[in-house]
From Swiss-Prot:
Membrane-related topology note: Peripheral membrane protein
Gene name of the record: SEC23F
Protein name: Protein transport protein SEC23 F
Predominant subcellular localization, coarse grouping: membrane
Organism per entry: Arabidopsis thaliana
Entries under Pfam families matching the protein: Gelsolin, Sec23_BS, Sec23_helical, Sec23_trunk, zf-Sec23_Sec24
Cited SUPFAM superfamilies: beta-sandwich domain of Sec23/24 (SSF81995), C-terminal, gelsolin-like domain of Sec23/24 (SSF82754), Helical domain of Sec23/24 (SSF81811), vWA-like (SSF53300), Zn-finger domain of Sec23/24 (SSF82919)
Length: 772
């Protein structure tokens, strides 16, 4: 358990470096059979456009291999005399073009410097095309009480004020019906109304909006804001206007907008047509700006009860589906709604557009059903209890902010992966969609978005992360690495930034093959236990969603026992002799906390909350994702500065303040004595300045966490034995429970649970790992 306190030191290091890549294994076994014995899959967590000061910017287009299309990189063998280079992936010899004629061993182009394994190319702009501005269509739910709608409208006004002046803005409101507002019609408020109780096709949407083939007007001269065909400009003129031109109109429109006026019968839910509204927004963007970076930003305040995407009946006596209902197939609307949002996802991916979801309600709104559309398009998701809550307000503002805390929103991306012969790609877990590009490096077995070596990333930002799973195709007789000891992987991300520039980020990595049939000693030295824990969490979540009757706890336990049995050091049938190398010592406690986490123990949460947690787990980097699995705990006391503390109930003391970072929530917990002194006002007295500073330190640190994170976490400030202390206690190792309360020290605490403690878990693990 002492290793828990060492974790803070590990977090201080920049594990991802310039490349933004972390792997479960940094040394690879040579055969498929040996890879299967590694227990933890061969996987890489990649942050395709993560910012780093050492990444080289190159103002020209990259060179590609004529055979395999891999791009020129620092691992290519270059013959300067013959002016050619050998591709490390397929060994094909390529000639340099004439504009590379001046290169030499002392005059290398940036992509050939050995330290620049990641470079970013700024692709030359197309002179015939104006760089497209970013596009935002806001979709606002009006089936809310006036107070909630007021909060949402205020947030929208603030967001529009933060947009770049050239950003195009559209607006759709919905309740019982969906309303498309023609912002370009300045004489009066002009609205196109769509019935909310039935599905509308793309053609019906276009015809009703006057954008169909029968009603297309001639193009207006000189207007080409991202429109690919001339006729589309009329739709842009009418429904999508630059923020600078429509800010005043939208302000007036929002001021006049009221809660949905359709009468709601007593004991019934409002008639809310979320599905139709999103269909209409997608159809509008598809008609006006296909293939251009655009986002649908939906603010939803309750469950869809009308038309496609319905998740619950209007009768309030019917509860919204729970995990038990989904398990028993007793959620009558669920599968149909998922199928509908899957069709929206496919449409948006084909158009290159993003769906962002801000769901704010005490009830569920249907995040579980919409997950496929948000995740496939790389959209952002924020779940909160109210549009007046800081989780929504601060997160929504962050989405549009510039500067240091900007999310770095980018559009229209693709990811391609090249790898050495005999390495196969099984698939990707994360915010992307398969482009179904077949090839020799595509595996037969599929994990997540598979059967491809290229993916669409409609929306991505500086923190977007994807997990790529690999397999080996070789058998013992044709083992890779027999001739070449190095393997190579290349990740190519092409995307459009917020200014409309086209960029290509290229990361090329090498790792070493090792012969694990002889010894596993070297292999273990390349094990990244944090990455392995996160990959296991993502894989477990995927299996729980896709495999019927999957027992997550049992599968994780068996995996951990096999890993410890394979790589632990012990005498057969002697648990006391069991030890793990330093590269593995943290992994069992990560698995212990994963078993107890919201990703596995889903029955404490709603399906919406589980979908939300999993979407963020799948898109965040390893450092953030590991905090979701195993929160970090910091202790503050008079005797010392902030110190990393064990994630254990034993860390609670009457004279300490604890700061828990559980990613989705940040908890400041005051010990009993501290809270009593604070309530007596000691911190206001000059002679107790040290106490005032002690109270202030965790508050400042918690605010820093809140400022740096998206979505903004929930901040909980509580006292020992107070009602909200549960937010801390639920995350701590229950080493002291009501069963052994007599062993407690004064001022500490107990947890009322029958869950096993980490110590008991490790004892059982040792016993099972050493069995003959």
């Amino acid at each position: 358990m002492a290793e828990m306190a060492d974790k803070a030191k590990v977090e201080e290091m920049d594990w991802e470096g310039i490349d933004g890549v972390r792997m479960t294994w940094n040394l690879w076994p040579r055969t498929k059979v040996e890879a299967s014995k590694c227990v933890i899959p061969l996987a890489a967590s990649i942050s395709p456009i993560r910012r780093h000061p050492l990444i080289l910017d190159l103002p020209y287009a990259p060179l590609d291999c004529k055979t395999c299309k891999a791009l020129l990189n620092a691992f290519a063998r270059v013959d300067f005399a013959a002016m050619n280079w050998v591709c490390p992936f397929c060994y094909h010899r390529n000639h340099f073009p004439s504009h590379y004629h001046s290169i030499s061993e002392i005059n290398l182009p940036g992509e050939l410097y050995p330290q620049y394994t990641t470079v970013e190319y700024t692709l030359p702009p197309d002179p015939s095309r104006v760089p497209p501005p970013p596009v935002f269509v806001f979709v606002l739910d009006t089936c809310m009480i006036e107070e909630e709608l007021g909060y949402a409208k205020s947030a929208l006004k603030q967001a529009i004020g933060l947009l770049p002046e050239n950003a195009l803005v559209g607006f759709v409101s919905f309740g019982t019906q969906a309303h498309v507002h023609e912002l370009g019609f300045s004489e009066m408020s002009k609205v196109f109304v769509f019935k909310g109780n039935k599905e509308v096709t793309k053609d019906q949407i276009l015809d009703q909006l006057g954008l169909g083939s029968s009603s297309r007007r001639a193009p207006t001269s000189g207007f080409s804001k991202g429109a690919q065909n001339g006729f589309q400009s009329s739709g842009v003129d009418r429904f999508l206007l630059p923020a600078s031109e429509c800010e005043y109109t939208l302000d007036l429109l929002l001021d006049e907008l009221q809660s949905d006026q359709w009468p709601v019968q007593p004991g019934h839910r409002p008639q809310r047509c979320t599905g139709v509204a999103l269909s209409v927004a997608a159809g509008l963007l598809g008609a006006c700006l296909p293939g251009t970076g655009a986002r649908i930003v939906a603010l939803v305040g309750g469950p869809c009860t009308e038309g496609p995407g319905t998740i619950i009946s209007k009768d309030l006596s019917d509860p919204v589906r729970s995990h038990k209902d989904l398990d028993k197939d007793a959620a009558p609307y669920y599968k149909k709604a998922v199928k509908f949002y899957d069709s929206i996802a496919k449409q948006l991916v084909a158009q290159g557009h993003v769906l962002d979801l801000f769901a704010s309600a005490l009830d569920q709104v249907g995040v579980a059903e919409m997950k496929v559309a948000v995740e496939s398009t790389g959209g952002l998701v924020v779940l909160s209890e109210s549009f007046g809550h800081s989780v929504f307000k601060d997160s929504f503002k962050r989405m549009f902010e510039d500067g240091e805390h900007s999310l770095g929103l980018c559009f229209n991306g693709t990811l391609e992966i090249n790898c050495s012969k005999d390495i196969k790609i099984q698939g990707v877990i994360g915010p992307c969609s398969s482009l179904e590009k077949k090839g020799p490096n595509v595996a037969d077995t599929v994990i997540g978005e598979g059967n491809t070596s290229a993916w669409k990333l409609c929306g991505l930002d500086k923190s977007t992360c994807l997990t790529v799973f690999f397999d080996l195709s070789s058998t013992g007789s044709t083992a890779p690495g027999a001739l070449n000891q190095q393997l190579y992987l290349q990740f190519i991300t092409r995307y459009q930034n917020s200014e409309g520039k086209s960029l290509a980020r290229v990361t090329t990595l090498t790792r070493q093959w090792v012969d694990t049939a002889v010894s596993t000693e070297n292999l273990v030295q390349g094990f990244d236990q944090e990455t392995a824990a996160v990959v296991m969490a993502r894989l477990t979540s995927l299996k729980m969603e896709t495999e019927e009757g999957f027992d997550a706890t049992r599968w994780l336990d068996r995996t951990l026992i096999r890993l410890c049995s394979k790589f632990g050091e012990y005498r057969k049938d002697d648990p006391t002799s069991f030890t793990l190398k330093p590269y593995l010592t943290l992994f069992p406690q990560f698995m212990f906390n994963l078993r107890r986490s919201q990703f596995v123990q889903v029955f404490n949460n709603s399906p919406d909350e589980t979908a939300y947690f999993r979407m963020l787990l799948n898109r965040e980097n390893i450092s953030n994702a590991i905090v979701m699995i195993q929160p970090s705990l910091t202790s503050y006391s008079f005797n010392s500065g902030p110190q990393a503390a064990l994630l254990d109930v034993a860390s609670i003391a009457a004279d300490k303040i604890l700061l828990l970072d559980a990613y989705f929530s940040v908890v400041v917990f005051h010990g009993m004595t501290i809270s009593q002194w604070r309530n007596m006002g000691y911190h206001h007295q000059p002679e107790h300045e040290a106490f005032a500073q002690l109270l202030q330190a965790p508050q400042e640190d918690s605010q820093m966490l809140v400022r740096e994170r998206f979505p903004v976490p929930r901040l909980v400030v509580c006292d020992q034995h107070g009602s909200q202390a549960r937010f801390l206690l639920a995350k701590l190792n229950p080493s002291a429970t009501y069963n052994n309360a007599n062993e407690m020290s004064a001022g500490s605490d107990i947890i009322f649970t029958d869950d096993v403690s980490l110590q008991v878990f490790i004892e059982h693990l040792q016993k099972l790992a050493v069995q003959s």
